[in-house]
C-alpha cells in the first residue's frame, strides 16, 4: 500500500559559497494560493516566454494575499509561520539553513517575490539566498538566462543569471549608520565597530580591534566572541535606524590579496555562522569603505568567507542622501542546486512543525 502524507511542502535546496538556501515554493495549504493548480514543479518545461510562464505559475493569489512584500512577510510571521518552522527547524532543517518563500511579484515589472527566513524568524534580504533562488528557478526551467527581477520586503532586486552557477545582482541602497561605536563588553573591554545597513543590520569590527584568527579551527572562539557582542548591543539598546535590531555581527581580517581584499566571519541571527561571504554583509562593508573614501564609484571589493568562498562587490552607484553617502552594491557569486524534494508532514509526528524553541 502506498503511503500518502497528510501534508507536504515542495522545496529546492542549493548552496551559495557553502551556505545553504531552501527555496520553498509549493505545498498543501499553501498560504499564497487558493488551490494547487498551476503549482511550480521541477518537471515543467520552459515556455517560449519563460518569464511570463513564471508569472503565470506563481500568480495564484487568493483573498488572503497581502499586496506588498512587507505585508506578506508580516502575514507569514503572524498567520502562517508553520511554513517556516516545518521547513527550516530540526528535524527537517537546521540552524544553518536559510529559507526563501516564493510569492507572486508585488510589481508588474518583476517576475517573482521572495520572503527570506531562518530558524529564528524573517529577514529583509539575503544576498547568498537570492543567488541560490535565481539558480534554483533557472534549473527548474522557470527563468531564462539573462535579466530577472525579484521583489523582497526591502525592495526589488535586479539580477542577471548566467545560465550556469553565476549570478550578478544589484542589492538595495546601503549605508553606514554610525561610525566607531564604542561598546563596553564584560570580559572583553571596549569593542569599537561601525553600524551599517546592507539589507540587514550589521555591527562591523576590524582586525585591529578583535585580533582574532579567522579560520575554521577557531570557530568556538569566534562564535562566543560575536555572540557576546550581539547580546551586549541588545542589552545596551544600541540599534540601527528607527531602533532596528542589529542581528548580524561581522569580523574582518586581511588575507592573500591575490584571492580577495579581505576575509570575514559573520554571526547570523540564529546563532550559526555564515559559510558564504554574506551578500548583505559585503554590502554593509562596501558602504563603510565608501564612507571612508576607500572605494569610489565603479570600484571593486572581493570578499572571502570563513570557508574560502568569494563574492565580488562593485560600487555601482554612489549618492548623497538623507543618511549620508549611500552605495548601490552589485554582487556576483555562484550557487549550486543540491536537491529537489517533497517534505512530508505526518499528523502523527509530534515534531511535524519542527522542534520549536521554548516560548
From Swiss-Prot:
Coiled coil: none annotated. Keywords: Isomerase. It comes from the Bacteria. One of its GO terms (molecular function) is 4-hydroxyproline epimerase activity. The active site is at 126 (proton acceptor), 278 (proton donor). Substrate binds at residues 127-128, 248, 274, 279-280. InterPro entries: Pro_racemase_fam (IPR008794). Pfam families: Pro_racemase. Its EC number is 5.1.1.8. It catalyses: trans-4-hydroxy-L-proline = cis-4-hydroxy-D-proline. It is an enzyme of class 5 (isomerase). Catalyzes the epimerization of trans-4-hydroxy-L-proline (t4LHyp) to cis-4-hydroxy-D-proline (c4DHyp). Is likely involved in a degradation pathway that converts t4LHyp to alpha-ketoglutarate. Displays no proline racemase activity. Belongs to the proline racemase family. This is 4-hydroxyproline 2-epimerase.
